[in-house]
Amino acid sequence: MLELYQFEECPYSRQVRLKMSEWEIDYVLRNVSKLKSKRHRLKKISGQTGVPTLVDSGRNVIITGDEKRIITYLHKHYRPQAEQ
């Protein structure tokens, strides 16, 4: 299962959401506070508070605070077969 931790106004999170929608990737959206000091669940899961954060529990992968790395990872593992 893929989970994306983000907040709506974050432009980096938006880039990831748009790419996941474009590639029709199923995921659970987890909204977090804009205030890093209130991102307790995210800190517990990833050890950090940066967004966007992608959690891929099926592959035991967590990528935090780097939209380019997240998109590259999704491209490698989840993009549609027709684009490969």
Model-derived regions: residue spans:
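GST-like domain detector, emphasizing the conserved glutathione-binding G-site
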Residues: M1-E8, R14-Q84
